[in-house]
Amino acid sequence: MSMKKHLTKLQQGHALLEKGKQAGDLAKQATNLLGGAGTAGMMDKGGLMKPGGFAGPLGGQGLAQQAAAGHSGAAKALQKAGQQLMGGSTPSGLQFTLTAGELAPETFVVTDFTLTEGFSQPFSLSVGLASADPAIDFPAVLDRAATLTILQDGVESRSITGMVARFEQGDTGLHQTTYQMTIRPDLWRTTLRQNSRIFQQQDIETIITTILKEHNIRDVVFSLRHPHPEREFCVQYQESDFAFLQRLTAEEGIFYFFEYSNGRNTVVFADDSGSVPLGIVLPYQPGDTSTIGEPAVSHMTSSAQVRPAQVELKDYTFKNPAWSAEFKEKMKEDTLQEMYYEHYDYPGRFKDEVHGKAFTRYRLEALRNDAMTGQGSGNAIAVQPGKLFTLTNHPRADLNQPWQVVSASHSGSQPQARETGSGEGGTTLHSDFSFIQHNQNWRPSPLPKPVVDGPQIAKVVGPAGEEIFCDQYGRVRLQFPWDRYGQSNDQSSCWIRVTQPWAGQGWGMLAIPRIGQEVVVDFLHGDPDQPIVTGRTYHASNIPPGGLPGSKTQMAFRSKTHKGEGYNELLFEDAKGSEQLSLHAQKDMNTKVLNNRDTKVLANHTETVDKNQTLHIKGHQMSTVNLTRTDTVGLGYALTVGAAMNTAVALSQSEQVGVHKSVIVGNTLSITAGDVIELKCGASTLRMDSSGKITIQGTEFKFEASGPVQITGKDIDLN
């Protein structure tokens, strides 16, 4: 049965249904008037109708039953016609059907559809529908799976499965209500969640898999033929999951397309034309093929555009500052256009040679992805991105080869499915598509990266039980307030560089931010993948040293003892009249001066050593005291002089020994006085003066000699 006949039968069924309803209403009225006795008063005992009565041996209730049976028959006829329209047991020609959610397959008839699809973009399928049900429940359809099937003579040509992203109820006519449905792939769900998060030491396949699993998208295939190394630090920043994946795949030269089977849409990620399989074979048949049963290409054009001919990318990495980090790539078709059209970009978004070379090649292939393209049209629903089509029967033999479909747009019309469309013609299908060489590596165009709008606040983090956590470059790990996945530990971020007031080759200033400190983070080029700590701040939990505002005149450099309560400090007090420089060492203090050191104190100088002091002077020491000097030694005092020792006193010198004094001279002891030398011990006195007179006084004199005793003098007087 033809589609037009199906529709005619459907409309007849609706008419019969309406008449059945009217008859049923009349029968009910008659039954009520007769008080439920039927037509007994209008019949004779033989059961024949009296003159002027209803024909037939039925009472009022019987008539109602017949009307109800007519209503049921009309409904069944309508359902049968709908089933035939949806592709019944004997379909013929081109047909479109749709199933959605758990609804019965005959719920909808397709009036028209438009399908747009392309490399690295979620397909969009808009379907016009009609249904005998005027009140389809939206929750039964929205966010549920739906499948559009295109059949030719009852054989499936292609089916497209996705999720219902939009559902709209339209006008209700005599027998039908119109609906509009938009179907998107499961991947489209990623457009609905915006996020900010950090991925560390992961390659792009791992990142993509993680995000898609969070959306319960598991029909994923990776067909990657080129290396895609791990990324040390990769940030999704205030962008949807979809925008993040689009950006990353574009950077890595990865494109994707969809495959449909068993009521599923599988997203395939690829990076080489070799991952695109062969598809349909299409003959070239010029003219209008929208209603022809055999798929064919009716129109075909080709075009070339001037595009950048070479790409140069440059970047920088602090781990190898001498590395030029510069890569170039040129197009191969040097006769097609001028070669000096160059695309130069900095930063190139790479930090190693593997990424640098690949990104440069990917960028050139992306910028030239439409330099040479073909455009075609026909009625082939099987033409789709991710499948090659092979052209045949073209008068140019070189065109009869496989081609790679980049994008396609299909539109189908089934006007006879509408209750008002019986005179609008039969089912039609039209396809427009673009294509490139089958061995060309198509790449998605580069996308802008999110830009961080100014500095941010973050907290220094590390492993439990540690206070300082850094690497050989003095980098630290941070917990950003927007990172919901970080656990404020040593895995919360990658190693992040810290600016210092002074930095050189083995010299400069170094202050490592400690765990728990709040820091100010900026981003190189506004790139969320390149954070750098530029400052530190106090807050309510980390208060400044001293007691503000009372100590507002002080400037302090105070550290904190690692896993302790002490500190080292250099303090400047700038209060007028109380200016002071204070140095506090929690334990040891070492000072090393390679040449001279001068210290000048204009008032008093006091030094206190609680324990011992050692002073070692390898050369000479000179000490000058303009007034008095007092040395007090609590216990012993020892002075050792390696050679000569001279003491010069301008006026007087006195020495007092409480108990004993011993003087030992190895050879000669010489004492010279200008006037008098006097030795006293109790009642004994020895006095020598400059005139040569020697006086010895004592109570008793005792001379003992082991040898001779000689006394020589001018006069010797012995009393």
What residue ranges belong to the model's regions?
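Short alpha-helix capping/helix-loop boundary micro-motifs
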Residues: 126-136, 368-379, 502-508
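A generic structural signal for residues embedded in beta-strands
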Residues: 148-149, 391-392, 518-521
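Short, Lys/Arg- and Gly-enriched loop/turn segments at beta-strand edges
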Residues: 154-163, 397-406, 415, 526-536
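Extended, domain-scale alpha-helical bundle/helix-rich regions
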Residues: 172-173, 202-221, 226, 234-438
